[in-house]
Amino acid sequence: MTCASNSNSFLNKAIEFPSPAKINLFLHIVGQREDGYHNLETLFQFIDHSDTLTLTATETPDIELLTPIDGVNNDDNLIVKAARLLKNRSNTDLGVKISINKILPMGGGLGGGSSNAATVLVALNLLWQCEFSLSELSSLGLSLGADVPIFIHGFSAFAQGVGDHLTAIKPQESWYLITKPECSISTKEIFTAVDLPRNTKKLDPTALNTSDFVTESFHNDCQTLVIKQYPEVAKLLAWLVEYAPSRMTGTGACVFTQFSSYQEARSLQAKLPKGISSFVAQGLNKSPLCSVIAKLSLSE
């Protein structure tokens, strides 16, 4: 596929795109594949807390990241990898300048890097006028990371396989206090650990007929291992569950605590122990990126 460059109204315009966080309301590991990847059953929900990517499509072919992230080589940055991947698959002659306002923590389990990659793929598909389908973009995204497809599809979903088989589900859009202790956790470290649970029984489909998934019927298989290895996470979780239902997201280190109102979440935030970073956010069953893309598509 070759992207269109003639009469492209998006060229040389700086356009902002949200790159939202996600939480895993539960994460069950139901097996391990021969290729080393794990078969999961997890429920993704977005939250209204996002990085912001600014992209400017250019007539020159270069891919430029104007705001490098400390400690991450540009060649290893998922933002750059995603742009290069789409450029190679589309055979476009166009380029892009990208900057990021990064507010999502790294090593937190909120999917920030995967979200950044997905936003780049979806945004450049529009700005370069490549016309790949969401399914095609998801296949590209999966090569960058297992969480990338959910951010491309843009709806809350029950995910199976490595996280790429998605079924739309609408959990309640609760308010959450998102907390992070003073540590970061490597996803690879957790998923390669010998004592990680890998044989959780698959869910009966009827178990999904609810809107509240932060109950004892669901759990995060990574959490038990993480609290053994990271006392900071263990201490934080023990404190939070005294107030409201709390669970680690992804492989951590972030923990979400569920509330029915913004005021309740803010009230507990004010009581947090020192050294804990935090923010309050609402669950979203539709990614804010979808709305931005829809508006821009109408303006072409």
From Swiss-Prot:
Where do the annotations place ATP binding? 105-115
Please state the pathway this protein functions in, per its UniProt record.
Answer: Isoprenoid biosynthesis; isopentenyl diphosphate biosynthesis via DXP pathway; isopentenyl diphosphate from 1-deoxy-D-xylulose 5-phosphate: step 3/6
Reactions it catalyzes: 4-CDP-2-C-methyl-D-erythritol + ATP = 4-CDP-2-C-methyl-D-erythritol 2-phosphate + ADP + H(+)
Q: Any idea of its EC number? A: 2.7.1.148
SUPFAM superfamilies this protein is in? GHMP Kinase, C-terminal domain (SSF55060), Ribosomal protein S5 domain 2-like (SSF54211)
What GO molecular functions are on record for this protein?
4-(cytidine 5'-diphospho)-2-C-methyl-D-erythritol kinase activity; ATP binding
Q: Which UniProt keywords apply?
A: ATP-binding, Isoprene biosynthesis, Kinase, Nucleotide-binding, Transferase
Q: Where is the active site?
A: 22, 147
GO-annotated biological processes: isopentenyl diphosphate biosynthetic process, methylerythritol 4-phosphate pathway; terpenoid biosynthetic process
Q: Does the keyword Magnesium apply?
A: no
Q: Tell me the InterPro entries matching this sequence.
A: GHMP_kinase_C_dom (IPR013750), GHMP_kinase_C_sf (IPR036554), GHMP_kinase_N_dom (IPR006204), IspE (IPR004424), Ribosomal_Su5_D2-typ_SF (IPR020568), Ribsml_uS5_D2-typ_fold_subgr (IPR014721)
Provide an example Pfam family for this protein.
GHMP_kinases_C
The enzyme class is transferase
Q: What is the annotated role of this protein in its UniProt record?
A: Catalyzes the phosphorylation of the position 2 hydroxy group of 4-diphosphocytidyl-2C-methyl-D-erythritol.
- NCBIfam families (alphabetical): ispE
Family statement: Belongs to the GHMP kinase family. IspE subfamily.
Name under which the protein is recorded: 4-diphosphocytidyl-2-C-methyl-D-erythritol kinase
- Tell me what organism the protein belongs to: Colwellia psychrerythraea (strain 34H / ATCC BAA-681)
